[in-house]
């Protein structure tokens, strides 16, 4: 298992660099991540690296117990770290819904779908969670506003790491305020791109 853990660690490190190496790779990653939005970032990276087309992933026990679906014989799991901090060298395996089949106890798998009738409630919840949103003319605009608010509120927690990450890059010579502004724009634009892929 330690050998496989090392291979997945290498894959993770390589993928971390690859997804940010150019805009096309970042967009490709976002296209994968928007389908598995409940996963941690490290899990999303590893799903992208191993099965970028995965639409809904769970562990085998969850497929069986929660949805009454059985994993197909010979299906290959998607290896992810068991815990985010990697304090233990342990992997967990996810399987995509396409790797499963229904049983007589199957329940419908809720693939994320936004209905028009919930739009006002969702916008209200976004505003109560992330603060006042300037443009609420559509759900997409409200989500963009919420993403900007969240980036603005949370960026102080990440600034030191962000400045450290600029060492050795073209951003090293750029003023810290500009780096922070670029980061906020990347977050907001990434959210917008993901939303355009899930057709809100």
For the regions a protein language model found, what residue spans apply to each?
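N-terminal accessory/interface modules of nucleic-acid-binding and processing proteins
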Residues: 1-198
